[in-house]
């Protein structure tokens, strides 16, 4: 029973860690998407402005070239507007270059570069959500099995069961950590592992069990001490 409970506890621990890891990955991707998507819109807007202003400038330059020289007033107006457009285009192109540099894209990269990265992130997010659903189902299953086995252990001495589980636990936890490392191809994060252990204890009600076992141990120790003291008094009437 003790070994079965500890094996199930290890399964719960693994699922808690994996779900926490998935949650962290989802959060990172969602934050990235919250940046990439608005910046794609901004990039698209810059490209459209550059295209529109370039077309307008080209049209005005052609008009100025064909305009008779004696239309002085119109020539001046065209020159002013062309200068404004030239300045606007320089600023827009500079802003576009900075935006591409921010995301480490090549200077000739287009909106497709943004869309490709966004699509990749969204695909990763979908995969994580699928895995999250799978591990949530597995976690619920492990919790149900744990509750059923715990009910079977109701007739066992809680102190002896607690002590037996404490002996088994270190090896089971080590095996769980190795299983995580094998599955994820990296050592588990100590912080996330600690968090997963706390979540496991919470889900299994381990804190209450431990308090109960410790109280029983203390009570029995006190009983043994009182019995021992009483026995010594009976054996030594003069005292």
Regions found by a protein language model. Name each.
Residues 1-239:
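Extended intrinsically disordered terminal tails
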